[in-house]
């Protein structure tokens, strides 16, 4: 059990018979009336998000979630397949288990997966990953209509905006949280 004071991003709650993860929360203390907490919750099974308001100090049941390092193996078209690094057991995760960051997954990449009662729920990539540019148009020195960026397709198929000096074959450090270019990696 936890109270609303214990809320933090990533905490998994048992709410209305479902496992829901806190994506965002905000403590609000209005001038009149009692304090409350606004939350955005994501159902870990279906991926749907809902907004819920809690009275401050309310006790909430939390789920015991075990985070493990796993290796991403492949995408079979309907799910992501990962393998536990210690037991070598394989698990299936739904296509939205990694959220938008799933587009940066490479085979044999080390990721973290959260488990509840032996079932894989959702995964997290490292904050940044190094990926090779598969294709990008040459950047013209005088082209500033796009603010000094151009689209580039990475080896995973994801497309991001990169500076004009980036060329096909460069290895880039990419932020998996928002898909932004961080830096060019020296080869």
Curated annotation (Swiss-Prot):
Principal localisation: cytoplasm
Cross-referenced InterPro entries: Elong-fact-P_C (IPR015365), NA-bd_OB-fold (IPR012340), Rib_uL2_dom2 (IPR014722), Transl_elong_fac_P/YeiP (IPR020599), Transl_elong_KOW-like (IPR013185), Transl_elong_P/YeiP_cen (IPR001059), Transl_elong_P/YeiP_CS (IPR013852), Transl_elongation_fac_P (IPR011768)
Family matches, as SUPFAM superfamilies: Nucleic acid-binding proteins (SSF50249), Translation proteins SH3-like domain (SSF50104)
Organism superkingdom: Bacteria
Gene3D superfamilies on file: 2.30.30.30, Nucleic acid-binding proteins
GO molecular function terms listed in the Swiss-Prot or TrEMBL record: translation elongation factor activity
Family, per entry: Belongs to the elongation factor P family.
Disulfide bonds: none
Name listed for the protein in its UniProt record: Elongation factor P
PROSITE patterns named in the record: EFP (PS01275)
GO BP of this protein: peptide biosynthetic process
Pfam families named among the record's database cross-references: EFP (PF01132), EFP_N (PF08207), Elong-fact-P_C (PF09285)
Organism, scientific name: Corynebacterium glutamicum (strain ATCC 13032 / DSM 20300 / JCM 1318 / BCRC 11384 / CCUG 27702 / LMG 3730 / NBRC 12168 / NCIMB 10025 / NRRL B-2784 / 534)
Keywords attached to this entry: Cytoplasm, Elongation factor, Protein biosynthesis
Subcellular location: Cytoplasm
Keyword Metal-binding: no
Pathway: Protein biosynthesis; polypeptide chain elongation
Keyword Ribonucleoprotein: no
One Gene Ontology cellular component annotation held by this UniProt entry: cytoplasm
Function: Involved in peptide bond synthesis. Stimulates efficient translation and peptide-bond synthesis on native or reconstituted 70S ribosomes in vitro. Probably functions indirectly by altering the affinity of the ribosome for aminoacyl-tRNA, thus increasing their reactivity as acceptors for peptidyl transferase.
């Amino acid at each position: 059990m936890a109270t609303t004071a214990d809320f933090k991003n990533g905490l998994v709650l048992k709410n209305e018979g479902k496992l829901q993860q806190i994506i965002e929360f905000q403590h609000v203390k209005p001038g009149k009336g009692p304090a409350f907490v606004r939350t955005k919750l994501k159902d870990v099974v279906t991926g749907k998000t809902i907004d819920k308001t809690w009275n401050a100090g309310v006790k909430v049941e939390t789920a015991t979630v075990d985070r493990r390092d796993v290796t991403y193996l492949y995408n079979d078209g309907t799910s992501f397949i990962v393998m536990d690094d210690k037991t070598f057991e394989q698990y299936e995760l739904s296509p939205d288990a990694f959220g938008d960051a799933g587009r940066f997954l490479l085979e044999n990449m080390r990721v973290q997966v959260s488990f509840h009662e032996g079932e894989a729920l959702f995964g997290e990539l490292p904050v940044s990953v190094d990926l090779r540019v598969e294709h990008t148009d040459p950047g013209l020195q005088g082209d500033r209509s796009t603010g000094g960026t151009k689209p580039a397709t990475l080896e995973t198929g994801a497309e991001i905006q990169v500076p004009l000096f980036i060329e096909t074959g460069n290895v880039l450090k990419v932020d998996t949280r928002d898909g932004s270019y961080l830096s060019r990696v020296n080869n």
